[in-house]
């Protein structure tokens, strides 16, 4: 009876305890598959003993907000304002850092006063950066209690990103950016200021402050400026058509190029007023404003970046294969981004992926395979969620998958769906990669180290495969695992390296040293990875290696191509870069080297000439010695950039070397700068200074130096210095010291050979023309020999018998010769003896009306001729009295 009473008292107590434990077990078993809103449902159903635990969990659940993703371009300023109303903060401490880390990327700066995130990325910062923004409440014990959190991404594009797109991304006024954009393939005129600064040593705030100071100085908008470091010591642009010096006498740091756009296709005549840059840069005003020395400035036309040439190679068409897996459970996609909590798995919605289009088969409705491995143990998840990106042509995959960060340059994985299988994507390669990874309890896409990956079903006629995919998981942040997609590396045959980015074209100038570092993303090999892990070889056509005496050389260890062309190499040259992996397979990239004429031509303001001891033949025939000479000459002037020296000529007379300095402006004559350079390397009498001698020894020993003006300074002589009594303007530009009679140059050849020959030829031509004119004038009016033969005899003409008319006797000279058709003369006029009043004097106006002949009067007397003259008329045109009568020649009687 007592036991029955005790049992009746214990039954209600055990019943309530058993019911409570049963509810907790059911809640734990259903928690992983329910959405996060189940917290509020279970809060109303559980007992008061668990209410405090769920209350703490509800307070720790962050509020997900949407901060839009951003884009940045290498060398251009980036700025984004974090909206505090989206975070929901009211007096909390806002913390901004890289997702999963405690600090920001090296190129970003957070300003807590203005709530702005700004920076300037460099070439090493390309890729996607995930930024976490969280607000924390300060506790009484000094610790920070998280209140809200959000994650957004910033994708950094390379420097040669599309200019209009980059301008639109950075410019607040889209209409202004569109109006200022140049036409397609139209060169953009850019003004560049060279600073003696190192961007890699600057903090993000110092870079932005430098741009702000230049903005206030030049009144150029911040989004139009570009700030990049100097690459390969190329401080100056050889294609610049205008340039000027700065106040820096010596370059110490690596150098920075600060540039902005002036217009489209401008030249020296149409460029806008640049006096606001030219004078301040030379006088030091710009340097004082910016806080860094100014080396110089130049203006050049930049051609817009053209899209890379796409190889039209037909790849093997993949065959989709349906993989049969275990039963799957389709989980509905939640409408919002869910941040993992200490007791719930993370479910990340897909976002947009910037990936190139592919030709892979698009799978149907994919589902995620979920495998249950016993009881699920809840472990706290550290670090915020990181969003993933899915291409526009891809599919939306649902499931308990944690977002991953894809390393830039590698292929981004996709969640596996069955059926059918998905494909792993890589740029410009159509390759199916079936695989079936499963999601474990930590909800990541990485496999456990002890799990053997599943071998996919072989796919026929597939000759290209995707490169290895590296993934950095976000949970836990202190341990990063790498995984590969597809078949394990040990079971695959060696793959041929692939060409990813073409070298395309290299520009070089006559007499100017150039060097090109082969980018690491030019080739890619599945086993050996990037280009710097491959063996590169430079070859000509038909697998012919570049010789030791070629003007182009290649260092396979440093993967550096360099050279020094001369005037005989002007034009286009084709070369082939071979990349070979450790297995012996290789890939080839064909590119061209365009050699242009000297950038300054004959307009250089000064010519430097030095005489060295030795024979010039070994220097002329050895490209390595010529390059060493150019480098030593640049070092003697204090320039680390060897492209500032343009080699003009190497002639006999020991070793006579001529060169110009590309840093000198063409107009007006930079007399002060040339004088400074002259005093740096030589004395006034032409002897080299010790600094110049030490810079070139022991390979080259200088004996004398001469510096003469040319171009805008053609009337000046710098070294040796002209005597004070003779003005420097009377010195001809070709005059050189007479210490060495064997010295010669192009000017001497023209002066002593070409010009005299042309003058003599012109004089001879003019003399010949004058002689011909005089001869023709003297011969004018003279008969030819044939005409002279006709009138050579002045005798009586010969008349033949048949030509003589015997019917009429020859006329006699005593009687007048009257023709047969003649008539008798008219009778003489009648002269009345008395004066008639009607008669009009002959001197009157009517003299023309007097008619002496009266043919109409029949009674008129005959004409009476006037009496002959008694005295001969001696006057002009009178005949002689006695005239010899005409005698006919005797008739011709033939023999």
Curated annotation (Swiss-Prot):
GO BP annotations, alphabetical order: basement membrane organization; branching involved in salivary gland morphogenesis; commissural neuron axon guidance; epithelial tube branching involved in lung morphogenesis; heart morphogenesis; intracellular signal transduction; membrane protein ectodomain proteolysis; microtubule anchoring
Modifications made to the protein after synthesis: Autolytic cleavage produces the alpha and beta subunits. In cutaneous cells, as well as in certain pathological conditions, shedding of beta-dystroglycan can occur releasing a peptide of about 30 kDa. SRC-mediated phosphorylation of the PPXY motif of the beta subunit recruits SH2 domain-containing proteins, but inhibits binding to WWW domain-containing proteins, DMD and UTRN. This phosphorylation also inhibits nuclear entry.
GO cellular component annotations of the record: basement membrane; cell-cell junction; contractile ring; cytoplasm; cytoskeleton; dystroglycan complex; dystrophin-associated glycoprotein complex; external side of plasma membrane
Gene3D superfamilies: Dystroglycan, domain 2, Immunoglobulins
SUPFAM superfamilies: Cadherin-like (SSF49313), Dystroglycan, domain 2 (SSF111006)
Residue ranges of the region described as Mucin-like domain: 316-485
Regions of compositional bias (Pro residues) in chain numbering: 859-870
Phosphotyrosine PTM positions: 892
Cytoplasmic compartment segments: 776-895
Protein name as annotated: Dystroglycan 1
Region: O-glycosylated at seven sites with GalNAc, residue numbers: 463-485
Superkingdom field: Eukaryota
PANTHER family: DYSTROGLYCAN 1, DYSTROGLYCAN-RELATED
Comp. bias regions, Low complexity: 413-447
Record text on subunit structure and interactions: Monomer. Heterodimer of alpha- and beta-dystroglycan subunits which are the central components of the dystrophin-glycoprotein complex. This complex then can form a dystrophin-associated glycoprotein complex (DGC) which is composed of three subcomplexes: a cytoplasmic complex comprised of DMD (or UTRN), DTNA and a number of syntrophins, such as SNTB1, SNTB2, SNTG1 and SNTG2, the transmembrane dystroglycan complex, and the sarcoglycan-sarcospan complex. Interacts (via the N-terminal of alphaDAG1) with LARGE1; the interaction enhances laminin binding. Interacts with SGCD.
Gene Ontology molecular function: any one: dystroglycan binding
Species of the source: Oryctolagus cuniculus
One Pfam family linked to the record: a_DG1_N2
Start and end residues of each stretch annotated as Disordered: 348-369, 413-499, 724-747, 823-895
InterPro entries in the record: Alpha-dystroglycan_domain_2, Alpha_DG1_N2, Cadg, Cadherin-like_sf, DAG1_C, Ig-like_fold, SEA_DG_dom
Lineage: Eukaryota, Metazoa, Chordata, Craniata, Vertebrata
UniProt signal peptide: 1-29
Segments of skewed composition (Polar residues): 832-846
Residue segments, region O-glycosylated at one site: 49-71
